């Protein structure tokens, strides 16, 4: 996590007219770039990014607002957000699953005893797209999962056009997903977290 810890300011006696400057200084004490797990308080910001990213393309969202709050309450450690100066710009939300393949139930359930992390959604704010942020976030997220001993693999479903993107991170196609949304069909992919655990242990991160 990249963060800045500002020193406690001393009492200063400054001339009038400096309030705007001080306000600017205070804003600059926020971390320029920070990665952290999300909290239920981040749910609205996450949903706004998700809705804009998915509605125009597929007409539906992977997670509704109440479902985002649900997962961020039950398993915040399976999420990761990228913040720029305190504002959420990209995120991933996951939960645990305890079966080999995804089912309709896996869209809304968190199975605490599961060994599989189900990635429900990866979304990037429109202002920050086409900058590689989704790739950076996914790489960090997989390393984050690799640091959790109970999690053995990650699974997700995506449209066929996105399969090559996820294959670059070690995901392998398992075939058609049993889940459909209207006329949309998906490919199910899985990724062993062993390599990400090894890379994390040997990267000094």
Swiss-Prot record:
EC identifiers of the protein: 2.3.1.87
Organs and tissues of expression: Highly expressed at night in pinealocytes and in the retina. Expressed at very low levels in the hindbrain and midbrain.
Known outcome of mutating residue 168 to R: No effect on proteasomal degradation
MF-aspect GO terms: 14-3-3 protein binding; aralkylamine N-acetyltransferase activity; arylamine N-acetyltransferase activity
Residues binding acetyl-CoA, per UniProt: 122-124, 130-135, 166-168
Description of what induces expression: Exhibits night/day variations with an up to 150-fold increased expression at night. Up-regulation is due to a large degree to the release of norepinephrine from nerve terminals in the pineal gland and cAMP signaling pathway. Down-regulated by light-induced proteasomal degradation. In the retina, 10-fold increased expression at night.
Protein origin, superkingdom: Eukaryota
Claim: Phosphoprotein is one of the keywords in the record: yes
Residue positions where Phosphothreonine is found in the record: 29
Protein modification: cAMP-dependent phosphorylation on both N-terminal Thr-29 and C-terminal Ser-203 regulates AANAT activity by promoting interaction with 14-3-3 proteins.
Pathway annotation from the record: Aromatic compound metabolism; melatonin biosynthesis; melatonin from serotonin: step 1/2
Role description: Controls the night/day rhythm of melatonin production in the pineal gland. Catalyzes the N-acetylation of serotonin into N-acetylserotonin, the penultimate step in the synthesis of melatonin.
Family: Belongs to the acetyltransferase family. AANAT subfamily.
Protein name: Serotonin N-acetyltransferase
